[in-house]
Every structure is written in structure tokens, then in C-alpha cells.
Amino acid sequence: GGSCGQCKVHVKSGGGDILPTELGHISKGEAREGCRLSCQVNVKTNMEIELEDEIFGVKKWECTVISNDNKATFIKELKLQIPDGDSVPFRAGGYIQIEAPAHHVKYADYDIPAEYRGDWDHFGFFKLESKVDEETIRAYSMANYPEEEGIIMLNVRIASPPPRDLSLPCGKMSSYIFSLNAGDKVTISGPFGEFFAKDTDNEMVFVGGGAGMAPMRSHIFDQLKRLHTSRKMSFWYGARSKREMFYVEDFDGLAAENENFDWHVALSDPQPEDNWEGKTGFIHNVLYESYLRDHEAPEDCEY
């Protein structure tokens, strides 16, 4: 507990002193106003607390897996169907929590396309197993945007142990998610979130890499397809090689349709077969060197 910082509440009375485990997520100003992490507050006497209105809109759904496809070597796009007649009233940039039961998963049973299996074999991942004897809950940002109704779409990277020590435990939730197939049932709850766009006219700069694509896609699609914003927007995405790039056609299409939007990719480890002539290196460095360094007012952008 105390690691994600997502369970903030305002304690009006009771609850004792704030704990060291909370201080990494709560500023001094927030602490003075009674902000606490609910998972760290021991209830020993009567307390008075204040919750955000959004908390009361949280629900639980049993969803059906529509598809669970690799979008990159170690990233799957999990698409879930919400029960008929229902919807998740989320905002772009929000997230859900997904539940995994106790399970024993063998990586050898995963459905990994041929184009990606070489790396899985190389690192010895097909020898791995994940054994979990208790329910697990984890949070994932949604990759879809609100007008993509009736579904939840997640980008999930497998949390394998480092290749140099495969004896370390596998990621409990990602190992479970990679084992899911069309038709399987999955329980989620939500919506949650604080990573929402501000309603201003300021320029928007989106930066992400790997499975960090999810909230970027949600925000950018929402701004351009639902809100039809005229705000200047750019998306800077980092990947290892061309094989690790995904949603390329989607973003190319958005850039062609919206003159206020452009997107850029930098590869940190382009392969010879990529014939890559674009930007290389880590995306945050590329963003600074090729754009923000000469930007007239980078402090006015929203990131």
C-alpha cells in the first residue's frame, strides 16, 4: 500500500498524523488541508472524511474479452465488451481497475504471433510461469476515448523478470492479461482518474513511449474526433524499433485530417531492416532538441 497515490481523501477529523509512506504523494499544502492516502489511514476512532464526487460514480462490470492482440513484441491491446445496455462514463485520460483471480499461467500457452516469437524465445520467456494464490487488482489507463462506447481498450506490457535473472517473479496482472482469449470474462471497476485535459486554448504537447501510448491515444482522439479542437497539438512517441510502433495509420490519418496536429516518432534502437531515416534516441531528448529548445514559450504548453 501507499505506492500509487491514487486513493486520496480529505480527513476532516480523526485519522492521526500523516505517515512517511504518504509524503511522497502529498504536498505540504495538501497535508495541511487534511489530504491523506486512504490505504494508509488506520481507523481506530470515529472519523469525518470528504470524498471526491467521482468516487460515487464508480461501478463494477463483468466484461467479455473481444480480442487480445499483440501490437508490439511485448505489448497487447486488450479489448473488452461492456455488458449490453451499459457504459463506462469515463473521461479521456482516465483509468479502470481490473481484477485477476488466483491463477497459474504458463507463458508457453500465450498466443504470440510468429513475428514476435523470436524475441520471446531469445529471452527465454516461454519457460516462465506465473503462480498467484490470491486475487490481484491493478490499474490501467484506457486507450479508447469516450465516443468509442461499449468497450474498454487497454495497452498492456508484459512485466517479465529481467532476462539476466528469470528466477524473479513475473508481473501478476500482466501475466494474467496475456493469457486471456476472446470470450473470457474479466471484472473491471471504474472509472477513475485525474489526468484530464484542461479546458484552455494552450498548446498541448503529448509525450509517451511503449504502453504509455494508452492515455495519449485517448486524449488525442478525444480532442480531435469528439471535441474538434483547434488547439495546436503534437504527439512525441518513443519506440525501440519500427516493429514496436503501433497505431501508426491512426495517427497518420489524424495528422492528415487536422492541420493543428502533428506527430513524431523517435527510435532508440532502430534495426538494420528498418531502413529508418527518422529521429533516433530517447523521445524526451528528441522533443527538447528538435522542438522545445527553440520554442518561444514552452512553459505555456500543457503536457
UniProtKB/Swiss-Prot annotation:
Co-factor remark: Binds 1 [2Fe-2S] cluster.
PROSITE patterns cross-referenced by the UniProt entry: FAD_FR (PS51384)
Segments of this protein annotated with the region Catalytic: 201-303
One GO molecular-function entry: metal ion binding
Major localization class: membrane
Domain FAD-binding FR-type stretches: 58-198
Metal-binding as UniProt keyword: yes
BP-aspect Gene Ontology terms: sodium ion transport
List of residues binding [2Fe-2S] cluster: 4, 7, 39
Keywords: 2Fe-2S, Cell inner membrane, Cell membrane, FAD, Flavoprotein, Ion transport, Iron, Iron-sulfur, Membrane, Metal-binding, NAD, Sodium, Sodium transport, Translocase, Transport, Ubiquinone
Subcellular location(s) of the protein: Cell inner membrane
2Fe-2S ferredoxin-type domain segment(s): 1-45
EC number: 7.2.1.1
Domain of life of the source: Bacteria
GO cellular component, one term: plasma membrane
Catalytic reaction list: a ubiquinone + n Na(+)(in) + NADH + H(+) = a ubiquinol + n Na(+)(out) + NAD(+)
Co-factor(s): [2Fe-2S] cluster; FAD
Family: Belongs to the NqrF family.
Subunit-level organization: Composed of six subunits; NqrA, NqrB, NqrC, NqrD, NqrE and NqrF.
Functional summary from the UniProt entry: NQR complex catalyzes the reduction of ubiquinone-1 to ubiquinol by two successive reactions, coupled with the transport of Na(+) ions from the cytoplasm to the periplasm. The first step is catalyzed by NqrF, which accepts electrons from NADH and reduces ubiquinone-1 to ubisemiquinone by a one-electron transfer pathway.
The protein's name: Na(+)-translocating NADH-quinone reductase subunit F
Organism of this sequence: Shewanella hanedai (Alteromonas hanedai)
Classification lineage: Bacteria, Pseudomonadati, Pseudomonadota, Gammaproteobacteria, Alteromonadales
